[in-house]
């Protein structure tokens, strides 16, 4: 399994500039660029395959590649909302798209995965690291659909970045952020 690649980034951030400014009690536009950058930084820390949550926050598209078909083809993000396509390199090294009637999307305690339907079989593939490619959509949807604890964690991170270093509040904010995101962290079973 190769590292996943985001092919379509989210259209928006989970927290808007106006929401962050209201949280920070900032009523001028002088620091909009700074606050926007801090929203992006806080979101990047949480979002996507490399984010601490291992989740897609806003709807986005990813590609996961495998060296071959298997009973379970795990997808590394949650929540997965759709399989857009499954393609493969056939025995002659020609890329083909698999019919949607051959596979299903399921999720268990370990996360989402693609498996073949009963009575179906996987086609033979050419031997290469990217023999099978799954394009999938993941994310909660729009910003308003992101769970509120995650949105609040982003606002607290932005607040911490905006206020600068103050060791007396750092520990409290860090503890609160981790408490807010704990239920959403992808657990390894």
Question: Model-flagged regions — what are they?
Answer:
Residues 1-189:
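Divalent metal-cofactor coordination and adjacent catalytic microenvironments
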């Amino acid at each position: 399994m190769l590292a996943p690649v985001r092919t379509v980034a989210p259209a928006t951030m989970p927290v808007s500039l106006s929401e962050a400014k209201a949280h920070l009690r900032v009523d001028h536009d002088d620091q909009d660029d700074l606050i926007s950058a801090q929203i992006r930084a806080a979101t990047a820390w949480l979002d996507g395959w490399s984010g601490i949550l291992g989740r897609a926050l806003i709807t986005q598209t990813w590609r996961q590649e495998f060296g071959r078909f298997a009973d379970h083809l795990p997808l590394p993000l949650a929540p997965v909302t759709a399989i857009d396509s499954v393609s493969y390199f056939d025995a002659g090294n020609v890329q083909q798209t698999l019919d949607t009637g051959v596979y299903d999307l399921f999720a268990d305690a370990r996360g989402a995965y693609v498996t073949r339907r009963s009575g179906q079989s996987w086609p033979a593939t050419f031997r290469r690291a990217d023999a099978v490619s799954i394009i999938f959509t993941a994310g909660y949807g729009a910003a308003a659909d992101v769970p509120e604890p995650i949105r609040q964690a982003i606002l607290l991170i932005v607040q911490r970045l905006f206020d600068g270093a103050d060791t007396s509040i750092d520990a409290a904010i860090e503890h609160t952020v981790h408490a807010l995101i704990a239920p959403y962290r992808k657990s390894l079973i």
